[in-house]
Amino acid sequence: MAASSLTVTLGRLASACSHSILRPSGPGAASLWSASRRFNSQSTSYLPGYVPKTSLSSPPWPEVVLPDPVEETRHHAEVVKKVNEMIVTGQYGRLFAVVHFASRQWKVTSEDLILIGNELDLACGERIRLEKVLLVGADNFTLLGKPLLGKDLVRVEATVIEKTESWPRIIMRFRKRKNFKKKRIVTTPQTVLRINSIEIAPCLL
């Protein structure tokens, strides 16, 4: 019985000591203690309907604000009008184009020479039209295709000026101490085209 009463007394003493240690003392102790309790209660309680900002509640990237459709339509009409005026007056400088021909993309302008790594079924002097035009640009504007520009909008013409063969390549195979040696000379046909003209329609729309 004495041991149990001693244990209870020691427990109460330890609890009182811990409360006295944790609770601040002094002239401003009451206000400091109330302020700390109020801060803890505010930090752990949220307003009704509040959702913390996390990667699940909102994406980590910044929000993209789309332009007003009416304003975008008006701006598009102004740009098309300016481009049409430059095309009509011819104040757009030298044109360049990106065309897809012979399984490759070529950036060309007038009087350029391009070397095709295969033989075309055309004679020298024949004129052809490059129909797959991906892009046409000038000093102040650029027309992009999705993926190609219309045939009635852009016209790129070229002329076959030369049909020749590539420089010979020597392929040599040799096995030492086997008396094996094999030599092969490889040449590939080539075609040279000259870009004659790049023309665009006088009106985009």
Curated annotation (Swiss-Prot):
GO terms for biological process: mitochondrial translation. The keyword Membrane does not apply. One of its GO terms (cellular component) is mitochondrion. One of its GO terms (molecular function) is RNA binding. It is found in: Mitochondrion. Disulfide bonds: none annotated. InterPro entries: bL21-like, bL21-like_sf, Ribosomal_bL21. It comes from the Eukaryota. Residues 1-39 form a transit peptide. Keywords: Mitochondrion, Ribonucleoprotein, Ribosomal protein, Transit peptide. Belongs to the bacterial ribosomal protein bL21 family. Component of the mitochondrial large ribosomal subunit (mt-LSU). Mature mammalian 55S mitochondrial ribosomes consist of a small (28S) and a large (39S) subunit. The 28S small subunit contains a 12S ribosomal RNA (12S mt-rRNA) and 30 different proteins. The 39S large subunit contains a 16S rRNA (16S mt-rRNA), a copy of mitochondrial valine transfer RNA (mt-tRNA(Val)), which plays an integral structural role, and 52 different proteins. NCBIfam families: L21. This is Large ribosomal subunit protein bL21m. It comes from Homo sapiens (Human).
